[in-house]
Amino acid sequence: MNFFMKIHAKKYKRFSLLPICMLLIFSLTACTANVEKRYQTYIKSLIAINYLGATKDYIAASGANQEDADALYQANIDLLTDNILTYYSVNIDDAPEMREQFESLAKNIYSKVNYKVDKARKDGSVYLVDVTIYPINLFAQTSSEVTAYVDTFNNDVKAGTYNDYSLTDYETLFSQGLIDIL
């Protein structure tokens, strides 16, 4: 009887190892898929927070708090705003309300972002995520209109149209024209 029990014990161990091995394989596969999904989700949320101000997924994926998420979005908006102001040599230091309008313009521009985030894939010991962000080409798209506006504005300056304007009013008028075009 003892011999009979040993044979069944060996068979039982072999059969019990099969489900354990299968469980291990399935759990590792699920973990890998889960890790890949987390990386893809994180990248999507990072783009969405920077361009769209969508904080919910970013907070969940990164562990950041609402204040940090809002600050990240605002920093990106400030960067685009500053780039636009620098590109067009606009000085609005004395007109803070114009800064708000340029920030609103930056938010509007970024709201049109078009991007694609592919699934994450493992390459050796690292995960890679392919991201395609389609360019907005704001400056190229509006170049002819802005050039015509600047030429007209400069001709009006030469004609003395703005001689009675303060520097702040002059810069505000010029800035508003750019915002209307962009």
Regions found by a protein language model. Give the residues of each.
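C-terminal motif of bacterial Sec signal peptides marking the signal peptidase cleavage site
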Residues: 27-30
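Bacterial N-terminal signal peptides that target proteins for export
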Residues: 6-18
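Subset-of-secretome marker
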Residues: 32-182
